[in-house]
């Protein structure tokens, strides 16, 4: 019987050259975050199902990979509902596990904890190009700080990580869920209508203002409310945060977002932009305040985002703890870098080739000599078709090669 050797749908294998880039990007991000004082932690990929389904993860709650209970008899299974069958699930993000981790270890952590976490998350998406069922996230979070200093630190630290990768064609979009709610309720919509109206407002870039108006009317919202909201959107687009007080947004909220924007502008030294965007929504239901995204020039999607989630930890311990996080979209970032023909800099990785007649001990001694000089060296027997062999190693990400000679082994770079 023929065996299917492809990865499961939505999963991927990585060849050496791509894995080299992925590891390099991850190392740069992690080292930048650690350099700015964030502490690396690790949480399990499996969580108790009640923690996952009770977390306000928005649409992601429908995409949880659930793990069936073990050891029950068939008759017991037949009498259970879907939720009864599963007691565990694979994490769909790193924020929910972090919240549980913090509650479990609160006594051992500082009052303001700066967490760094990197790991794979899992979502039962419909498999299609660009959508994976397993993908890596790189998160930094600040727990225990209710001030806007936390947002400023997250935004500037994430920007430093991107700069360390020579990514410079990006800007930060920022909004606040309280601004969204204030304006939408002021225009006459109800609390119950808020989430669905937000989903439509979020489509401005794709369908334009007239498209938003048509979709709101098609959903049978009151025409007066729709008219007020469109007028509000047009005015906010022109004046930014200056007109928000006219729509019932509290002065404290406006001052907070203005302070973040002005502080980041000063700290960015003009290397990237930050702008207020009322139509920025973000999908997670657990956000309570500021929300932000990284916009990459020329792409139709973000390469990272986050926000404040001051109510999530309270669901675990009955006490609200302020928290805010930022996640780099690792997969999108790596894919874009590869698209731009990114090469790992200063990669001293070579292949040392030898003939059958060479003494293998001498070849290994030469390899160790090169390694002592800082090279990463792989040793292979020279193929009859040398050109094809060298082309393969260049494709694997090697910077050069050397053919062993007892007197003079010369390293030759592929791109010279």
Predicted regions and their residues:
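Short, basic, helix/turn surface patches
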Residues: 65-77, 199, 401-416
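Positively charged, Gly/Ser-enriched RNA/tRNA-binding surfaces
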Residues: 21-36, 47-48, 82-85, 93-107, ...
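TRNA-binding/sensing appendages of the translation machinery
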Residues: 1-92, 96, 152, 156, ...
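Short, surface-exposed recognition loops or helix-turn segments adjacent to catalytic cores
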Residues: 169-178, 197, 275-281
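Short acidic, glycine/serine/threonine-rich loops at helix termini
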Residues: 53-57, 127-133, 183-187, 287-288
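N-terminal targeting/leader regions
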Residues: 2-15, 194-243
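Acidic, His- and aromatic-enriched active-site or binding-groove loops in soluble protein domains
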Residues: 60-74, 188-211
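Short, conserved phosphate-binding/catalytic loop or strand-edge motifs used
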Residues: 132-138, 174-182
């Amino acid at each position: 019987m023929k065996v299917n050797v492809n990865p499961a749908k939505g999963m991927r294998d990585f060849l050496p050259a791509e894995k080299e880039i992925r590891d390099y990007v991850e190392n740069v991000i992690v080292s930048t975050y650690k350099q700015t004082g964030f502490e690396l932690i690790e949480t399990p990929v499996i969580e108790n199902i009640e923690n996952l389904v009770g977390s306000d993860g928005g649409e992601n709650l429908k995409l949880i990979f659930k793990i069936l209970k073990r050891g029950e008899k068939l008759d017991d299974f037949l009498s259970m509902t879907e939720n009864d069958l599963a007691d565990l699930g694979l994490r769909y993000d790193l924020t929910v596990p972090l919240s549980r981790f913090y509650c479990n270890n609160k006594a051992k952590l500082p009052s303001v904890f700066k967490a760094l976490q990197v790991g794979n998350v899992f979502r039962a998406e419909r498999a299609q190009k660009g959508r994976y069922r397993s993908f890596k996230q790189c998160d930094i979070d600040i727990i225990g700080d209710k001030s806007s200093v936390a947002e400023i630190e997250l935004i500037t630290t994430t920007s430093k990580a991107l700069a360390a990768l020579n990514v410079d064609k990006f800007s930060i979009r920022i909004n606040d869920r309280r601004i969204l709610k204030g304006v939408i309720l002021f225009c006459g919509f109800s609390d119950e209508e808020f989430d669905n109206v937000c989903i439509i407002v979020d489509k401005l870039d794709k369908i334009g203002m007239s498209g938003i108006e048509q979709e709101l009317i098609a959903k049978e919202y009151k025409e007066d409310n729709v008219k007020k909201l469109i007028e509000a959107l047009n005015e906010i687009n022109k004046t930014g945060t200056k007109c928000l007080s006219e729509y019932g947004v509290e002065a404290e909220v406006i001052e907070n977002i203005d302070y973040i924007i002005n502080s980041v502008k000063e700290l960015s030294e003009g290397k990237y932009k930050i702008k207020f965007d009322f139509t920025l929504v973000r999908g997670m239901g657990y956000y309570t305040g500021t929300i932000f995204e990284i916009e990459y020039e020329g792409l139709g999607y973000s390469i990272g985002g986050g926000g404040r989630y001051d109510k999530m930890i309270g669901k675990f311990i009955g006490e609200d703890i302020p928290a805010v996080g930022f996640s780099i979209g690792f997969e999108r970032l790596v894919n874009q870098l590869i698209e731009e023909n990114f090469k790992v800099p200063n990669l001293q990785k070579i292949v040392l080739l030898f003939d059958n007649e060479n003494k293998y001990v001498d070849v290994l001694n030469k390899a160790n000599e090169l390694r002592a000089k800082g090279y990463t060296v792989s040793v292979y027997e020279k193929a009859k078709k040398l050109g094809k062999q060298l082309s393969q190693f260049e494709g694997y990400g090697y910077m050069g090669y050397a053919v062993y000679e007892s007197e003079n082994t010369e390293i030759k770079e592929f791109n010279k």
